A protein has these predicted regions:
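Loop/helix-junction capping segments adjacent to catalytic residues or to phosphate/diphosphate-binding pockets
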Residues: 123-127, 193-194
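PRPP/pyrophosphate-binding module of the type I phosphoribosyltransferase fold
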Residues: 147-244
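Alpha-helical repeat scaffolds
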Residues: 16-24
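Substrate-recognition/cap helix-loop segment adjacent to the acidic, metal-dependent catalytic center
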Residues: 125-144
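Active-site-facing substrate-recognition patch
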Residues: 30-113, 151-180, 220-222
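Short glycine-rich phosphate-binding loop at a beta-alpha junction
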Residues: 112-121
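The feature marks helicase ATPase cores and/or their adjacent C-terminal helical subdomains
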Residues: 2-3, 130, 238-242
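Short helix-capping/linker turns of helical repeat alpha-solenoids
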Residues: 1-4, 9-12, 27-30
Length: 245
C-alpha cells in the first residue's frame, strides 16, 4: 500500500505523480492525500496564482504558492524553487521582478498609483526586502515608489517568529502625510491569514490613502481535510477511467 506513495514522492513532475497518487489514495494510504494536495494546490484553493481575486473588499493578486518548511520534502522541483525565491526575496537577495511585474499586470491598475510596502519588524529588514522591487516598479512604470512614505520607528518581534501572531505589536511605523489622496497598491512577500493586510489597509485609509489593490509574491497554501482530497481524487479517477487515462 505504501509503494504507490513512495514512487510518487520520488517523481519530480506532476504528471508522473498523478496516477500513482490516485491509486495510493484509493488503496487507503494515509500520506497520499497530503502529497496530492501539495502537488495540485490550485484544486483546493479558491484563489489561483496570477488571477485576480477579492479579499475582504481588496483586489489581490499573488504570483505563486508558498509551502511551510515541514512540507519541503514533498514538493515538486518547481515548487521548491519558488519557495527558495520567497526566502531570497525576504533576505533582499532577489527582487523577483518577473513575478511582481506579472502580478501588477494582472491587477491592472490604471492611472497614477503608488506602491506601499508592508512594514517589517526593523527598518533594516524593511529596506533590505523592498528597496530592489520598489526601484524596479518605479523604473518600469508599474507604480511610483512609496518606500519612504513609511518610516519604521522601532524594532519589534517578527510576526513569523512570534508564537502568537495577534500578540505582536504592529504599531512600530509612521505614515507620511504625503499619502493623503494617493491611490496605493500594497506590496508584500506573503499572504497568509490576511490580518496584516486588513490592518495595514485600514491604517492607510485613516491617513487618507485610497487602497486600490494588493500584490503578493506568494500565498501560503492551507492544507485541505483528507476527506476533501479524497472526493476530488475520486472525481478525477472516474474521469480518467472514462477517458482511458
Amino acid at each position: 500500500m505504501l509503494t504507490f506513495c513512495q514512487y510518487a514522492v520520488a517523481c519530480c513532475g506532476r504528471e508522473e505523480r498523478e496516477k500513482l497518487m490516485r491509486y495510493a489514495i484509493i488503496a487507503g494510504n494515509r500520506h497520499a492525500p497530503l502529497l496530492y494536495a501539495l502537488t495540485y494546490p490550485e484544486r483546493f484553493d479558491k484563489a489561483r496564482p496570477l488571477r485576480l481575486f477579492e479579499f475582504r473588499g481588496i483586489r489581490c493578486v499573488f504570483a505563486g504558492y508558498y509551502f511551510p518548511q515541514r512540507y519541503e520534502n514533498w514538493l515538486c522541483d518547481d515548487q521548491s524553487e519558488f519557495v527558495r525565491k520567497v526566502y531570497d526575496f525576504k533576505e533582499g537577495k532577489d527582487p523577483c521582478r518577473n513575478c511582481f511585474s506579472q502580478a501588477f499586470r494582472v491587477l491592472s491598475v490604471t492611472g497614477d498609483v503608488t506602491a506601499v510596502f508592508m512594514p517589517c519588524s526593523t527598518s533594516r529588514r524593511y529596506h533590505r526586502r523592498f528597496s530592489g522591487i520598489a526601484a524596479f516598479l518605479e523604473s518600469g512604470g508599474y507604480a511610483r515608489s512609496g518606500l519612504d512614505l513609511i518610516c519604521i520607528t522601532e524594532d519589534r518581534e517578527s510576526k513569523h517568529t512570534s508564537g502568537r501572531r495577534s500578540g505582536v505589536d504592529t504599531a512600530n511605523y509612521m505614515m507620511a502625510r504625503g499619502l493623503r489622496g494617493k491611490r496605493v497598491v500594497i506590496v508584500d512577500d506573503l499572504l497568509t491569514s490576511g490580518d496584516s493586510l486588513l490592518e495595514y489597509a485600514h491604517n492607510l485609509e485613516r491617513v487618507g490613502a485610497i487602497v486600490t489593490g494588493a500584490v503578493f509574491l506568494a500565498r501560503t497554501f492551507r492544507m485541505p481535510p483528507p476527506a476533501t482530497v479524497r472526493r476530488v481524487v475520486w472525481k478525477h479517477h472516474l474521469s480518467a477511467l472514462l477517458t482511458g487515462k
